[in-house]
């Protein structure tokens, strides 16, 4: 694939990884707050699990792009 396209994809992947990290941190804060306030955090915890899977997928995509850019095997 053309290097310019890969670089653009890498920028997008980096942004996605950063966004998912921020969402995970926010969700973790909500869990702590809910538990501290005596509220049920089950749904918040389930959502955190989904966010962690999404983050893992985004990191894998970033790694794939880096491999393609720099020829790592």
Predicted segment positions?
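Anionic, Ser/Thr-rich low-complexity intrinsically disordered regions
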Residues: 1-73
């Amino acid at each position: 694939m053309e290097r310019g396209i890969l670089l653009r994809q890498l920028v997008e992947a980096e942004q996605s990884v950063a966004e998912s990290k921020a969402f995970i941190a926010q969700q973790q804060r909500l869990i702590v707050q809910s538990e501290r306030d005596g509220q049920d955090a089950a749904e918040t915890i389930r959502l955190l699990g989904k966010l962690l899977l999404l983050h893992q997928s985004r990191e894998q995509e970033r790694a794939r792009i880096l491999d393609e850019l720099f020829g790592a095997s």
